[in-house]
Amino acid sequence: MPTYANTFPPYCIAPGDQAQVWTSADGNLASGTKTQRIAITAGGPATRGRLSLRVSFSGAPGVISLQLHTSDTDVDTDYNNEGAAIAAVNASNVARAEYANVAAKFARLLATTVTNAVTATVELAA
């Protein structure tokens, strides 16, 4: 698991954009993993935006708890849970969630629990 670091600026997404914050090349998406973060730009005068999260596992992940983390500052300890945790995947081992009122400036995924050793691709879209 990569160590969380904010040495380099994060990818920035605006409404209509998406970014991969974890790929299979990053290794297994294991319990306790935090993905890379993204910066979210405002889409005009609106102060809150939409954000969607898609996690595609290479196989059955077992028991999962995936949590969108958001923050107004890019400080690891300032990230907080946004909405309810994702606890299920579909028949293709894909988990997806939408968040309608995100006002934070940064977002990432916390894989609180993943019981099977599987790789994944994680995408965040505005």
Where do the model's predicted regions map?
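Short, surface-exposed beta-strand/strand-loop-strand elements in extracellular ectodomains
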Residues: 61-77, 121-123
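Solvent-exposed, low-complexity segments and loops of surface/extracellular structural proteins
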Residues: 2, 30-31, 41, 62, ...
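Solvent-exposed serine/threonine-rich low-complexity stretches and specific carbohydrate-binding patches
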Residues: 24, 80-91
